[in-house]
């Protein structure tokens, strides 16, 4: 026996989401049948609106409703520093910290030829034009992940930016705050010892 | 350390086995297909929770039974540690001192073993890739930094090769990114080469001693790290890094032509030399065997140096491959030092005379009998 077409289609749609297989998708689909009518309408609207109403900021590349985005438009932010991150989720993490008040630049990925991402495929060219145009920027903070690809991307950006005389910095590596040395893996410890600072 | 007792239940062709071993040389004597190697395998399994012969644990459980158990007690300097592994179709659990270990990685290391099987000859005879794999395995066990750098190196290498291929189709592509990848590769590569040379020196020192003894001082074994980087450039990581960078620059055009990275530790090799001649090309079968054996036996001393305890040595069908004098010297080299398990189909005259108080076990269809020698 087959499922009726509407639910089969719904299962199929859920399966397009990452991390959801056939069984989870079926469970979700049947759950949707029992949901309040209003909730379902809200859900459907939210799905459509997320794609329709969001675009990428023409300055920093972050997702936004208005172009340029709130952060780029905010004059109270420190115009001297730009923090470069891999994707928009990283901007949110940094913002939740509430201690960084500068600008952002979102790369939408890292350099990885294996995944078909070369220098032209991520948002680097826009960063360079931005630095050329905007003379207020004095520091580029590179906050790509501590993976080989993240490191390569950081090195690549620093090579392109440094000749212009703008300061390029990289986030620190090492122990995570509040963790026990006992539970840290050996490479993290090694990096932490290597990157120790004078007191 | 040595393995004092071993108990098998439904393991391979052993239905139930309880046996006590001697701390010296234990000879497992039997005809073909009686279960000699199965017994060695069970000891290897007790040490490392996996088999050297198969990746499927199901193969280890006797036919028509559902679960197997391997247990034993390990005598260390002052303590006796009981070990136990239970194996069923659902998986396995390991116990140290009757306490279940939540992770197998916590269990491994209680009993250290070194296995020498006829296949190990390929360290000498085989392709450079076999030797690289061997040194990566050995040195990775001793240094987590080495393990980290080789993992990073592999991943950067893949990216770099892919990018070079892309540049072939698009010659005007970004060269700065290639520079970045080259520098990254050189940085990890330099750490790897530096550590390889350091570890090889240690291994060479111990191998030479063993080799000298087996060959009665007639032959001298030495190692040579084969790399486009000359040895006078290799005394610090900074120098190796600079040398690798220069090589990448020099090879760039050729690399773009061939579409891959042409220098680096992933292409280096180790040459085993006996009396300054390359054993893998000019050595006799016996010399090759002796070299492989010396390298393996050197691991015993290296492990003692690193962990403070001698491991247990498992020799699978090695005696039959060596001539009488090499047998004699092998046995003297290990006598009174490490607990050794030797499988063989017959105990030749020389070996029998030489081994002091050997424990000889006759194996017949999965049943063990300790034979009382006069």
From Swiss-Prot, chain A:
Q: Residue ranges of the C4-type zinc fingers?
A: 57-72
Cited InterPro entries: DNA_Rcmb_RecR (IPR000093), Rcmb_RecR (IPR023627), Rcmb_RecR_Znf (IPR015967), TOPRIM_dom (IPR006171), TOPRIM_RecR (IPR034137)
Which SUPFAM superfamilies has this protein been placed in? Recombination protein RecR (SSF111304)
Q: Which CDD domains match?
A: TOPRIM_recR
> Residue ranges of the Toprim domain?
80-176
What SMART domains does its record include? TOPRIM
Which molecular function term from Gene Ontology is one that the record holds?
Answer: zinc ion binding
Sorted keywords for this record are: DNA damage, DNA recombination, DNA repair, Metal-binding, Zinc, Zinc-finger
Alphabetized PROSITE patterns for the sequence: RECR, TOPRIM
Does Zinc appear among the keywords?
A: yes
The biological processes this protein is annotated with in GO are: DNA recombination; DNA repair
Stretch forming the signal peptide: none
Which family is this protein grouped under?
A: Belongs to the RecR family.
> Tell me, what does this protein do in biology?
May play a role in DNA repair. It seems to be involved in an RecBC-independent recombinational process of DNA repair. It may act with RecF and RecO.
Q: What is this protein called?
A: Recombination protein RecR
